Amino acid sequence: MSRHLTVDIFFDFICPWCLIGKRQLQVALLKLKENNPDVEVILSWHGVQLLPHIAAEGVPFDAFYQQRLGSHEAVRMRQSQVRQAANAVDVDIDFSNIKLMPNTAKAHQLLAMAIQFGTATQIDQLLERLFSAYFHLSEDLGNSENLLKIAQSCGFDTDVINNTLGQLNQPFNSANTGSNGVPYFIFNQRLAVAGAHPAETLYNAMLEALVTQG
């Protein structure tokens, strides 16, 4: 008899720790599949808009972080820390290539459409493409034309995409993790892990959630 493991992931596209956490989760899931092939995993992605007050057209990336962290040196140290963690999971983040801090409401609404109409493969493709658009390609995640092209590249129906994009001026109802921030993982709706932890930590949390499944 198969067992079930639900994984709720709370994230934002502009958070590098969320991309790093996604990679760690993938490694943990592969180990779970190898050691526990009877477990059926159900992933649920929940968008958290960290900066809802960012202008719809976005703001300059460098200026945003200079103001947020107070100095060029503080920004450099923070980015170095992130790059080191990203490299450990084979993710290359070139902050010098990122020009815009976007408003992510439309991107999250697009993902909500994908969750409603897409397959698990399409959902993951869209997640990867949206992360890549921001961290690797310097594309504006608040631009509807960019989002249309991204969704089309993942195989979504053009009419469904256009209908979704036509409603993107509506407010985005962001998920809430309280003071836990993102990434935030909940396993089987009972065991939570906050932050971008190593894959082994996530794997052990999965095993514990399965043991306490009842």
Region spans (language model):
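Glycine-/small-residue-rich active-site loops that bind phosphorylated ligands and cofactors
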Residues: 16-17, 102, 193
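Short active-site neighborhood of thiol/selenol oxidoreductases, capturing the structured segment around
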Residues: 4-16, 25, 43-46
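Structured loop/turn residues at beta-strand edges in well-structured enzyme cores
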Residues: 3, 39, 180
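C-terminal cap of thioredoxin/glutaredoxin-like
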Residues: 9-10, 22-34, 112-214
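Structural alpha/beta surface segment adjacent to cysteine/selenocysteine redox centers
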Residues: 23-133
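Flexible, glycine- and charge-enriched loops at secondary-structure boundaries
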Residues: 18, 72, 199
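Short, low-complexity, intrinsically disordered N-terminal peptides in bacterial proteins
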Residues: 1-4, 213-214
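The canonical Cys-X-X-Cys-His
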Residues: 15-18, 185
